[in-house]
Amino acid sequence: LFSCLDEIAWLYNIRCNDIAYNPVAISYAIVEKDKAHLFIKLDKISQEIEQQLAEDGIELHDYHHLFLFLDEQNKENTYFVDTNTCNYAVFNHLAKKFEVREIESPIPLLKAVKNTTELDGFRLACRKDGVALSKFYYWLENRLSQQPITELEAAEQLTRFRSQDKEYVSDSFGCISAYGPNAALPHYSATPEQQSEIHPKGLYLVDSGAQYMHGTTDITRTMPLGELTELEKEDYTLVLKGM
């Protein structure tokens, strides 16, 4: 029984948007010797997808019917689960009736080996992201030559450039747009109430990414926006050498 959402998405080759920034569906999966089951909100499944899954030997069930399904199964069944990802309620329900064996899920190692289609998709996603970032760098330099901008304005503009690609789906996480001292804060998050103005001097960090139909990107860049102090130059160089 699988409950880790990215593993299920990979195993059945399905994508959804149930969780912000992540192309996964809230679901469970059970794989038997000769067939498989997917527990998911059925209104998300089109007739075409349902037919394709059926052809692949995958039976669909309502997400909330997992326990009902398990209650109807032969008590002689044995279920294998990864307790690093299986939640407490599911594990307890299984253990009341069945033999449960704790294993490490085989999927992470399997999906770590990329096929040609996946590799080509990654490269294409990176090229698409490079186009958006090039536009962003040009825009940032020109805007700052006219007036300061806020950290959120910069983040929103980067998303707009990415979304110009027809195969852009969403950002892959909330953009970290951090100017000056804010860039030193781990996972800094600008808000309308608390953010800094960006000026044509000092250092600006942007940590962002996108979900494209072909793959996912995640980049971090630290940009000099004007003349730097000797300390800024030294810090930047030491960080670069340490990578």
Where does each model-flagged region fall?
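Active-site neighborhoods and metal-handling regions in enzymes and metal-associated proteins
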Residues: 1-243
